[in-house]
């Protein structure tokens, strides 16, 4: 029986004619799309920073190549600068994008760090590209949030109560070690004479001093945050008393008391947070977004349970899937027809309720206003309902956690004629509240149908980002940096939606 022949295999065979780089990738590959997109992006902010440097020295890599490299890496779930650098050797598509150059991982990390703000700003351009392609319909937007792990361990966080206890304990340990060192010195002086072979400060003493310095620094920062939070509360209370003092309908004694209280509260606030004090680091990446406020007592000191993380002080311990994690709260506003993210923010405030107004408002400022919007119960508040109504948004916000197929419980509104027996003597009932109107709207078949769509709009986006592309933890630390990184991640998500749409259109044209 004749032996089976094999196809030729000569992996070390040189090419007589060098192959074209595009011959290595199939037609319609994502790498081609990324290069086409980068050619259209406005990168003047990045180029301006590079051109401002001294022309002497190492020649930099082309900024469009570096941006394309990062976009493709993020699109394929590669976020580590070391892995991206290795991929320029191991991955054919990455090698093609890099033009067979191999930036060091330090170069990739530095480029991302220096141009992080400009890279995050690419999100707006990605949304505009999706708009131009007809992917953003703005008929139905869905708002949702998810917890993204911080680049820090929750075990690196310490409460204010623990800080104070550890500060005293370590100070006592340092004192005991110094006493032991002095005793050792006295023994050596008696044996060898003064000044001979004095013992060095033990390494354990240096470790404790270093640990003590870190705890004291974190303690001061936590106290400063609490002071500013309490000062803001006092100033808000003082403003309320000013309104009372200005109301001429009130008795003179009450107005005088209000003026005294306002003055006292402002003096206390200025003592805790001087108006001309130095600027503070941290806080929200955007002044319009909610940010975590350190709980403070009446005297401005932190509460016992107030915490601060030593590795990433801006991150907070939050609850995700029933467990406590060190994380940030990432928010997206998603188009219902294409799952394109039209607005993306991140902050360190765990509850979702305060995000609705600033996130939707930011989208509206860029001309992205929905006629219908859905959100889960985490965003339910009278303030949010009234704001949506005043801005012409038909909102569907769940009143309580429920399955998407579950029918909301019937609620009798104040004006329901079936609520009470008809009576000519019955006084006119007040109009239903915004919450009652929302319950009634969600109880209708149309309301249930619209709200059920939320499950297929925002939630799959988080699945694609966190599971398909494995972005579950930020690579960077600090609120401003993770905000830009989240914008970059969402920009890549939108570009992938645009890529998928183009591929479908090509397939349809071929089939037609």
In which residue ranges do the predicted regions lie?
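Anion-binding and metal-coordination hotspots
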Residues: 2, 8, 70, 78-90, ...
